[in-house]
């Protein structure tokens, strides 16, 4: 029996069709695109996915987190999934940058964890911090490190008690003490997300992720819930019918060119929603809208407190 799928969209070139003009005036391009996606009821926009594919990434582009930061301001409901890799970016930088964008978007940001970033490679074929090969296992280490850092400073510790003068209950801030793949003491210098953890997408091998992205037609294995990517515009209708009947498929990810985006959003998406193949746009954080529970791990309850010897019970206002 078919079930309603969540809807993600990747726009080739992130919607930048005239690279010289659009990179010089990105605000118009991003605002326009975000508005169109929201009106169409798209659940989330994946920004920068092509960076993970050799031969697909263009020579001129804006950083996905920069686009997402602007899109957060220009949108109210649309989820923003940022593509990034533990390649030239250290997990600490990834964790801080992603959580900062999520704060700007009030809990609407996710992460597509890439193995390799062709947009920032600059001839680097390994992790520029550790020298590790850029494999799926390496990405799993980066995902674990980022998740751990997100949990070192829980958002709930920010109490903002004016009467007592306590800003943060610092006894809840934990060390990361990451030793596998990376050596990171932590904690992160930004509080965690209202989502708990940001949702994470990974290609095929979903170790450590909330959702696995597979290509339409590829075999579906067990493990994390699956999002199926459809690249051919002419087969979207048939693909949605088929994907909605895959037991582990929870969503579809449409990669479209700017030239056909209008037709897909104005004709294909409403028709599929009318047939019950796509769900109605939800409310709340991105994690809540996608029905994703917060992972149980990593558990930092046994990690050392950062401020064990602090003289006061919390950061002062």
Where is each model-derived feature located?
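Active-site mouth loops of central-metabolism enzymes
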Residues: 8-28, 83-92, 115, 128-130, ...
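Alpha-helix-loop-beta-strand connector modules within alpha/beta enzyme cores
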Residues: 57-81, 141, 222, 266-280
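N-terminal beta1-alpha1-beta2 module of alpha/beta enzyme domains
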Residues: 1-74, 197-198, 204, 209-211, ...
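Acidic (Asp/Glu)-rich catalytic clusters
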Residues: 1-2, 35-39, 68-76, 98-108, ...
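Substrate-recognition/cap regions that form aromatic- and gly/pro-loop-enriched pockets
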Residues: 229-275, 279
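Extended, intrinsically disordered, low-complexity segments
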Residues: 132-143, 148, 152, 275-317
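Flexible, glycine-rich active-site loops centered on histidine and acidic residues
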Residues: 5, 10-23, 91-172, 247-251, ...
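Hydrophobic faces of well-ordered beta-strands that scaffold small-molecule active sites
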Residues: 3-11, 45-47, 78-84, 107-114, ...
């Amino acid at each position: 029996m078919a079930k309603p799928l969540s809807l993600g969209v990747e726009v080739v070139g992130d919607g930048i069709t005239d690279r010289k003009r659009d990179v010089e005036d990105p605000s118009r391009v991003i605002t326009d695109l975000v508005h169109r996606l929201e009106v169409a009821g798209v659940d989330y926009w994946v920004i920068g996915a092509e960076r993970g594919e050799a031969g697909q990434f263009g020579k001129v582009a804006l950083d996905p987190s920069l686009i997402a930061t602007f899109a957060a301001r220009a949108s109210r409901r649309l989820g923003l999934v940022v593509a990034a890799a533990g390649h030239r970016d250290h997990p600490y930088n990834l964790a801080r940058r992603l959580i900062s964008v999520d704060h700007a978007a009030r809990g609407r940001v996710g992460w597509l964890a890439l193995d390799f970033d062709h947009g920032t490679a600059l001839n680097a074929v390994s992790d520029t911090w550790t020298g590790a090969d850029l494999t799926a296992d390496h990405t799993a280490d980066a995902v674990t490190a980022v998740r751990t850092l997100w949990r070192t400073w829980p958002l709930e510790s920010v109490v903002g008690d004016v009467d007592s003068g306590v800003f943060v209950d610092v006894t809840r801030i934990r060390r990361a003490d990451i030793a596998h793949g990376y050596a990171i003491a932590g904690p992160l210098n930004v509080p965690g997300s209202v989502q708990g953890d940001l949702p994470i997408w990974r290609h095929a091998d979903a170790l450590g992720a909330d959702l696995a992205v597979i290509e339409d037609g590829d075999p579906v294995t067990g493990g994390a819930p699956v999002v199926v990517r459809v690249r051919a515009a002419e087969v979207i209708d048939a693909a949605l019918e088929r994907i909605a009947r895959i037991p582990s498929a929870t969503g579809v990810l449409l990669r479209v060119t700017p030239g056909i985006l209008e037709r897909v959003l104005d004709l294909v998406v409403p028709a599929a929603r009318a047939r019950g193949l796509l769900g109605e746009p939800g409310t709340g954080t991105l994690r809540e809208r996608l029905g994703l529970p917060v992972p149980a791990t990593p558990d930092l309850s046994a990690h050392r407190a950062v401020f064990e010897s602090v003289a006061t019970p919390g950061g002062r206002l």
